[in-house]
A protein has these predicted regions:
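N-terminal leader/linker segments that initiate helical-solenoid repeat arrays
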Residues: 22-77, 81-85, 93, 269
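Helix-start (N-cap) detector for alpha-helical repeat units in TPR-like alpha-solenoids
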Residues: 72-73, 106-107, 139-141, 156, ...
Length: 269
């Protein structure tokens, strides 16, 4: 039965890592020049909002979008919040309209590509990201996003090359190191993944999503208590509970907690 345990672990790792990388791709626009990653009315970062606040933010920005659907900044912010609410198809529809109105805007093309990736349109997303990139002024965010998409397409060697190119432009950037670590999660090399993710989490400006990815890599190795401790770090009680819920939701796919615990204790019969 060892082969079936390996198969279960492979499916689990791929499903969990793709979700985490998808979050990284979706969040990448939060550091761009066109969007601040926070809602102007409250000044609160999107990543720190609870579910109710995210719904309210979607309603508020949605009203601004309806008034001026051609505005790039409003459209990108709206799509970001929609993705945080799990409304990927609607986010993609928003970015399609914004891209029609701003066909040469590099930030819009980047956000459009990320929306396509979040909606599962990976080949289209890759093409859009490549259109947004300029060889004479390469953007590390686009390099990292391209790598994340390539990882989801199963092209890990190319993906890691893009991450390293991004690191050449922006050394020690936490989001790039995090995506590189998740690439090794996909390859089931959890020790290497943990090394990169710990480095990512130690960088100035590392956000909650980076710690979530580290917690995932630790949890997938069976160190569940340590994973929860990482997920709770430097957050308010509400944010910590949200992070732990996120971690558990990923690790409970296909009864992951039980399967991995049994596997780690040597129960392969």
């Amino acid at each position: 039965m060892a082969a079936s345990v390996t198969s279960v672990r492979l499916r689990l790792l791929r499903g969990a890592a793709l979700l985490a990388i998808g979050v990284a791709v979706a969040g990448c626009a939060g550091k761009s020049n066109i969007t601040t990653g926070s809602i102007a009315r409250t000044g609160k970062p999107v990543g720190e909002m609870n579910a109710s606040e995210l719904r309210n933010a979607a309603d508020s920005i949605g009203q601004a979008y309806e008034k001026n659907p051609k505005d790039a900044a409003t459209g990108i912010n709206y799509a970001n919040v929609l993705r945080m609410n799990g409304r990927n198809e609607q986010a993609l529809a928003v970015m399609q309209q914004v891209a029609i109105s701003n066909p040469n805007n590099r930030e819009v093309l980047a956000a459009y590509g990320k929306a396509q990736a979040a909606a599962g349109q990976l080949e289209q997303a890759l093409n859009t990201i490549l259109r947004a990139q300029t060889p004479d002024r390469p953007d590390w965010r686009l390099k990292s996003a391209e790598g994340a998409i390539l990882d989801q397409l199963g092209r890990s060697a190319e993906a890691r090359q893009r991450y390293r190119e991004a690191l050449d432009i922006q050394p020690n950037e936490s989001s790039i190191l995090s995506n590189l670590g998740m690439s090794y999660v996909l390859a089931r090399d959890l020790k290497t993944a943990e090394t990169y993710l710990r480095s990512a989490a130690s960088q100035p400006g590392a956000d909650s999503s980076v710690r979530q990815n580290l917690a995932l890599a630790v949890g997938l190795q069976g160190r569940f208590q340590e994973a929860e401790t990482i997920a709770r770090q430097e957050l308010t009680a509400g944010q910590a509970e949200a992070n732990v819920a996120y971690l558990r939701s990923m690790l409970t796919q296909q009864n992951a907690w039980k399967k991995l615990a049994a596997d780690d204790s040597g129960n392969t019969n």
